[in-house]
């Protein structure tokens, strides 16, 4: 019996280790999970390859004040939590499964605009300084301390010397690894239907990358996956009969937006509201899989060492 128990532990650890190794090997190839923020103040989760198969809506609850709603969302690189900012300029963490909101801080400067880009600067976040970038369709440009709500008001957004707005914003190389992250920021301007880039977000000067190729409204969600720099946008195309939004891939070299599919719930694209924000969900780092693997192998080793023969 003792030998059987020992062998069972060893076999279980071996099988589990193989499973974890296989998961780690296949994870990068799988489509990213995306969390969307709807115009009805709810969260929805879907696979980037099948946006029509969204989860049931999780309506956001727990916001302070009356008739408040979340305007934009992003996943923080250093802790993997989902953050959002409300219409009364308060910062929250959000539970994507339940919609429950937990207040973090009041922003020291009020938001100015009707559409917002909201993204964490991965370099600043790993260095523990003001890391949250908030930009708006009025050209507002804020660097926010996501722990305290402190705000550094920075230069208004411009391109070619002309004022410009931003309805979506996303940093490339957005991960918690100092060896691979960067401060390059892309923004989408729905007024010009263009993609812009800056390597110095605080200066506010943007370079035109290219046209999206679509006439969009101000209802835009935009994010770039940290694992492979795949860029996604939730766009609502102006002048369409449905007024619905869909998931688009964004070419960061040309600016071109290519439709992946309409948003839907459980395959029904007739019942999903447009998205005004989205973020690529946090995924375990390769190091996490390595730790899991080491732990499971250690379990087998301990079982062999401690069980009496």
Can you describe what each PLM-predicted range is?
Residues 53-64, 102-108, 150-161, 197-213, ...:
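Beta-propeller fold detector
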Residues 33-37, 81-84, 131-134, 178, ...:
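Conserved beta-propeller blade signature
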Residues 9, 18-20, 27-31, 277-296, ...:
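Short, threonine-centered small-residue motifs that mark membrane-proximal processing/anchoring sites
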Residues 71-78, 110-128, 164-181, 218-228, ...:
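Structural signature of eukaryotic scaffold interfaces centered on beta-propeller domains
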Residues 42-45, 90-93, 139-145, 192-199, ...:
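Structural motif
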Residues 48-51, 95-98, 146-149, 200-203, ...:
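Short loop/turn segments that connect beta-strands within beta-propeller blades
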Residues 301-309:
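C-terminal membrane-anchoring or membrane-association module
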Residues 31-70, 76-79, 251-265, 278-282:
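N-terminal segment immediately downstream of the Sec signal-peptide cleavage site
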């Amino acid at each position: 019996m003792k030998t059987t128990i020992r062998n069972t532990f060893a076999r279980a650890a071996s099988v589990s280790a193989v499973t974890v190794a296989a998961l780690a090997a296949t994870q990068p190839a799988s489509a990213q999970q995306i969390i969307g923020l709807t115009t009805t103040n709810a969260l929805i989760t879907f696979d980037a390859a099948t946006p029509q198969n969204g989860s049931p809506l999780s309506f956001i609850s727990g916001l302070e004040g009356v008739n408040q709603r979340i305007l934009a969302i992003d996943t923080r690189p250093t802790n993997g939590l989902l953050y959002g900012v409300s219409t009364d300029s308060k910062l929250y963490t959000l539970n994507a499964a339940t919609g429950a909101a937990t207040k973090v801080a009041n922003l020291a400067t009020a938001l100015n605009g009707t559409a917002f880009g909201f993204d964490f600067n991965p370099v600043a976040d790993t260095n523990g300084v003001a890391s949250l970038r908030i930009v708006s369709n009025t050209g507002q440009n804020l660097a926010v301390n996501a722990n305290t709500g402190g705000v550094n008001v920075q230069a208004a957004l411009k391109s070619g010397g002309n004022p410009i707005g931003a309805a979506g914003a996303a940093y490339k190389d957005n991960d918690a690894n100092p060896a691979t992250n960067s401060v390059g920021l892309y923004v989408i301007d729905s007024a010009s239907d263009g993609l812009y880039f800056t390597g110095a977000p605080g200066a506010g000067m943007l370079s035109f990358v290219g046209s999206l190729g679509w006439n969009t409204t101000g209802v835009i969600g935009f994010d770039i996956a940290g694992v492979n720099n795949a860029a996604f946008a939730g766009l609502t195309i102006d002048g369409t009969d449905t007024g619905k939004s869909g998931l688009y891939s964004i070419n960061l070299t040309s600016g071109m937006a290519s439709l992946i599919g309409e948003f839907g719930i459980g395959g029904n694209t007739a019942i999903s509201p447009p998205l005004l924000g989205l973020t690529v969900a946090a995924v375990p780092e390769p190091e996490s899989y390595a730790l899991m693997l080491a732990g499971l192998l250690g379990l087998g080793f301990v079982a062999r060492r401690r069980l009496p023969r």
